[in-house]
């Protein structure tokens, strides 16, 4: 619906509400129109007004809970969902939404409890099984995750998200051929999805099919999606095939597309360090730090590069910076102690 038409309907509805201020259905219609416009403040305002006159309206309570959920205020979200649940304890959607809140809080057992209650009330809803699968996936229990994705797909075989997520789980389980089949099925359903093309290319990379992998990366580049991410994944694949010249060019292209993100600088620096271009890698780590100055990992890698370049003093300084940002990182402290020992020995050697 065009915005002009929506505004016209809003005006007509507001006029009706002036005559019938206690007509609950008008409030719901108005909130849906504002939702269609993406005006979430207005949606919240309308639902609050509705709850003033009908405090036990479950639809409004769930709506408020969902709005606060997307605002990432999960406590307020849960408050509204719980109130809705006391009024209607047989609504599967409320249990599902509460499960989502606990999933965001990484409370596995409570999230699973509420998702299972939702299934008790509606066992034919694929999204609930998908949510449980994601829960297990986040817990790195890929076998259970796979089982729930398969259940979700038995209900809705063309659910693109379930197919992609199942493909990713199969990838984690080293079932690369199965993952590839799933990703290709998704690509038939969503041929304009650049990230699906990348998933296919990544699977082909692991399966050592360079020509096909590169063909899908090239296809992804034509889809005009997240080109920065595509170039980075393409570069990683090129590195796997030991085509370091191509990998470097692809990282440089990613940097050209978004010079304010640190990932490509970091990965290119790692590539340069791994191919004995130490001084260039040092420069690239420094560029990454200009973009993201408080990254302890970058300082640690810079320290390693300086150490390989026999510049012990600069290595010490870089590791100190890493420790100052991440003081609880034992690995940084251990490496720093070894580098510091070398530094002390080198100073002693100069003084002898």
Name what the model sees in each region.
Residues 36, 70-71, 104-105, 138-139, ...:
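Register position in tetratricopeptide repeats
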Residues 24-25, 58-59, 92-93, 126-127, ...:
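Helix-start (N-cap) detector for alpha-helical repeat units in TPR-like alpha-solenoids
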């Amino acid at each position: 619906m065009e915005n002009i038409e929506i505004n016209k309907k809003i005006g007509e509805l507001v006029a009706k509400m002036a005559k019938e201020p206690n007509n609950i259905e008008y409030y719901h219609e108005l909130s849906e129109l504002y939702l269609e416009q993406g005006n979430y403040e207005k949606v919240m305002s309308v639902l609050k007004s509705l709850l003033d006159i009908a405090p036990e309206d479950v639809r409004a309570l769930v709506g408020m809970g969902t709005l606060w959920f997307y605002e990432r205020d999960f406590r307020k979200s849960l408050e509204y969902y719980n109130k809705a649940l006391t009024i209607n304890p047989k609504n599967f959607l409320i249990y599902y939404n509460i499960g989502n809140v606990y999933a965001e809080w990484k409370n596995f057992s409570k999230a699973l409890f509420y998702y299972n209650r939702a299934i008790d009330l509606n066992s034919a809803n694929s999204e609930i099984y998908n949510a449980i699968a994601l829960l297990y996936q986040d817990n790195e229990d890929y076998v259970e995750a796979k089982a729930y994705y398969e259940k979700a797909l038995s209900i809705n075989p063309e659910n693109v998200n379930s197919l992609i997520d199942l493909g990713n789980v199969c990838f984690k389980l080293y079932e690369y051929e199965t993952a590839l089949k799933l990703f290709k099925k998704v690509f038939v359903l969503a041929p304009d999805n650049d990230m699906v093309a990348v998933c296919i290319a990544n699977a082909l990379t692991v399966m050592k099919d360079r020509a096909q992998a590169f063909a899908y990366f090239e296809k992804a580049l034509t889809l005009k999606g997240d080109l920065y991410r595509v170039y980075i994944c393409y570069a990683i694949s090129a590195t796997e095939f030991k085509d370091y010249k191509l990998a470097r060019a692809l990282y440089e292209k990613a940097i050209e597309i978004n010079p304010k993100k640190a990932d490509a600088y970091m990965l290119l620096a790692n590539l340069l360090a791994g191919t004995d271009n130490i001084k260039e890698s040092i420069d690239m780590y420094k560029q990454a730090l200009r973009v993201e100055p408080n990254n302890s990992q970058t300082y640690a890698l810079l320290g390693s590069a300086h150490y390989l370049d026999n510049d012990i003093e600069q290595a010490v300084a870089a590791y100190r910076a890493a420790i100052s940002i991440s003081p609880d990182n034992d690995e940084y402290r251990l490496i720093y102690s070894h580098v510091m020992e070398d530094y002390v020995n080198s100073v002693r050697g100069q003084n002898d």
